[in-house]
Structure formats: C-alpha cells, structure tokens
C-alpha cells in the first residue's frame, strides 16, 4: 500500500475582501475616530529622550524592516512595530544601548498580533547577533506591554488601504499594483520620523495618491484625485497635498541615498530557516522599484 502526500508548501488561509465591510461607511468612520489615540502628541526627541537621536531611530527602522523582509512577515507587522516603538519612546526615557532590544520586542509583539506564525524569540536573538538574550526579550516584552497599557490593536495606515481603494474607480488590473506601491510608500514613511505624528489616514491617502499618479492608473487630474481622497478621509485638501509631496520627496531622497551607497548585506538568517516562495505574502517591494 502506497501513501500519497498531497501537502504542498504551507500557506496561511486568508479571507477574501468583503465588499459589504469595505463599502460600509461606519467601518471607515470608526477607524478615523480611533486613529488619533495611537499617534504621538509631540516629538519625544525634544521632550523625553536624551541619548536617542533621529538618525538612531532611522538605523533601527532599517534593521527592523530587513528582518521583516527576511522573514516574509505580513505587510502590517513592520509599521505596527514602529508604532509600538514610537509610543514607548514618547513616554519612557531609553538608553541607546537598549534601542535594538526595544525594536526586537516591538517586532515580536507586532508579529503576534498580525502574523499567522509569529516571529520567535530565538530567531530575534540570532538577528541581534546574540547581543540580546531570550530572558531580556521576555522581560522587556512584559515591560513594553505595561507601558503601552496592553493596547496593541493600534490603527495604522495599512488599515485604510483597502477601504480607500474600494472607493476609487480604478481599473481592476491596476488595483493590485497601486496597492503594492502604496504599501512600499507606507514602509518608507514608517522609517522616517517626520511622518510619526501624521494621522495614519493621511499617510494612507497620500501614499495612494502618490502611487496612482506615479503609475498613471487614473484618468482624473492630480488636483481632482487629491480632492477625492481628501473627501474620503475627511481631511483638508491642502494638508493632504502637502503630505503627498512630502512622501514623494522622501522617496526621491531614499532613491538618491540608494544610488550613492552599495546595498547593505542582508541580516543574518537563523539556521534551518527556509525561504518561502514569491507567492507568499511578504513585506512590500523594494523602494527602488517605485516610479514617480
């Protein structure tokens, strides 16, 4: 008797888009009401932190993004981890020697909330080159949870993407590409502290606007598209236009830096970890693939 194994590569089951939820205005309004709760009120570099500087946050953000890319995390994991990081730093003075430990803990918590198979403590320790111990990660996990008051279900810009795209009359064959480009813009914004105090809905609409105009995916003019997006998100047209211009400027700066420096080596991968196929949902495409 022969046994036939029909199991393929393990894929997480995913629910399809629900048009009734996406089209229900109450869902969007609920997110808009909640988003301000999770946005830092002021620059913690001026009010709270003494050792940590903006460039340190940026270096940490790039490392966290590389780890999420290497582990093919869901698109929401990295921005959510950065949200935890900013909220923690906005209320707790932290030494720069503890910054990587804090970033690893934030990724651990975000993956537990948004990932089907969350990151493990052992893998995160390897990515820190064992500068962080499992005991430290567990202790700091409890510490960060307490400082965040266990409120981890933060509203982030990714939560608005599907709702906004559903309300735009985009060709069906361009929707997926626009979404992927917008996700890359969101990841770029998460690495830049300039956007930390922007409402997630504004970052989402600005990213979609930049993606649509860059791809030429909509027949409407830029001003008409901005007015439409501002009406969907309930924000001022001028504020949204300024946000979109800032996102495009951040992209140009990132491309300029990428052209001047050689690609950084990938973070150390845990032994025995297997790479997953390109069909697996992963963090957004590289920023160099974006065209304005």
Swiss-Prot record:
PTM sites of type Phosphoserine: 264, 279
Modified residues (Phosphothreonine): 283
Taxonomic source organism: Bos taurus (Bovine)
Limits of the Cyclin N-terminal domain: 27-152
Family: Belongs to the cyclin family. Cyclin D subfamily.
One of the GO biological process terms: positive regulation of G1/S transition of mitotic cell cycle
Region of interest (Disordered), ranges: 255-292
A Gene Ontology cellular-component term: microtubule organizing center
Cellular localisation: Nucleus; Cytoplasm
Protein role: Regulatory component of the cyclin D3-CDK4 (DC) complex that phosphorylates and inhibits members of the retinoblastoma (RB) protein family including RB1 and regulates the cell-cycle during G(1)/S transition. Phosphorylation of RB1 allows dissociation of the transcription factor E2F from the RB/E2F complex and the subsequent transcription of E2F target genes which are responsible for the progression through the G(1) phase. Hypophosphorylates RB1 in early G(1) phase. Cyclin D-CDK4 complexes are major integrators of various mitogenenic and antimitogenic signals.
Assembly and binders: Interacts with the CDK4 and CDK6 protein kinases to form a serine/threonine kinase holoenzyme complex. The cyclin subunit imparts substrate specificity to the complex. Interacts with ATF5. Interacts with EIF3K. Component of the ternary complex cyclin D/CDK4/CDKN1B required for nuclear translocation and modulation of CDK4-mediated kinase activity. Can form similar complexes with either CDKN1A or CDKN2A.
Keywords: Cell cycle, Cell division, Cyclin, Cytoplasm, Nucleus, Phosphoprotein, Transcription, Transcription regulation, Ubl conjugation
Segments of skewed composition (Low complexity): 272-285
Name of the protein: G1/S-specific cyclin-D3
Pfam families, alphabetized: Cyclin_C (PF02984), Cyclin_N (PF00134)
GO MF entries: cyclin-dependent protein serine/threonine kinase regulator activity
Keyword Repressor among UniProt keywords: no
InterPro entries per record: Cyclin (IPR039361), Cyclin-like_dom (IPR013763), Cyclin-like_sf (IPR036915), Cyclin_C-dom (IPR004367), Cyclin_N (IPR006671), Cyclins_cyclin-box (IPR048258)
Keyword Ubl conjugation: yes
Post-translational modification note: Phosphorylation at Thr-283 by MAP kinases is required for ubiquitination and degradation by the DCX(AMBRA1) complex. Ubiquitinated by the DCX(AMBRA1) complex during the transition from G1 to S cell phase, leading to its degradation: ubiquitination is dependent on Thr-283 phosphorylation. The DCX(AMBRA1) complex represents the major regulator of CCND3 stability during the G1/S transition. Polyubiquitinated by the SCF(FBXL2) complex, leading to proteasomal degradation.
């Amino acid at each position: 008797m022969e046994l036939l194994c029909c199991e393929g590569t393990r894929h997480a089951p995913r629910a399809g888009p629900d048009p009734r939820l996406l089209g229900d205005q109450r869902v969007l309004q609920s997110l808009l009401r909640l988003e301000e709760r999770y946005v830092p009120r002021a620059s913690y570099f001026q009010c709270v932190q003494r050792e940590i500087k903006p460039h340190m946050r940026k270096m940490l953000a790039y490392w966290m993004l590389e780890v999420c890319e290497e582990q093919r995390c869901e698109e929401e994991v990295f921005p959510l981890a950065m949200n935890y990081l900013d909220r923690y730093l906005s209320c707790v003075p932290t030494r720069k020697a503890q910054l990587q430990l804090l970033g690893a803990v934030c990724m651990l918590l975000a993956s537990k909330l948004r990932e089907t198979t969350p990151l493990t403590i052992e893998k995160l320790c390897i990515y820190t080159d064992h500068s962080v111990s499992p005991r430290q990660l567990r202790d700091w996990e409890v510490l960060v949870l307490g400082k965040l008051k266990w409120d981890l279900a933060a509203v982030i810009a990714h939560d608005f993407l599907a709702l906004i795209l559903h309300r735009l009359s985009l060709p069906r064959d361009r929707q997926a590409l626009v979404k992927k480009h917008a996700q890359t813009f969101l990841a770029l914004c998460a690495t830049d502290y300039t956007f930390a105090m922007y409402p997630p809905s504004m970052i989402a609409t600005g990213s979609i606007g930049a993606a649509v105009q860059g791809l030429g995916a909509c027949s409407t003019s830029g001003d008409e598209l901005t007015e439409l997006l501002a009406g969907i998100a309930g924000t001022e047209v001028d504020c949204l236009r300024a946000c979109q211009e800032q996102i495009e400027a951040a992209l140009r700066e990132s491309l300029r830096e990428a052209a001047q420096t050689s690609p950084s080596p990938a973070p150390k991968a845990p032994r025995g970890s297997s790479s997953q196929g390109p069909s697996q949902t992963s963090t957004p495409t590289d920023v160099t693939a974006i065209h304005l």
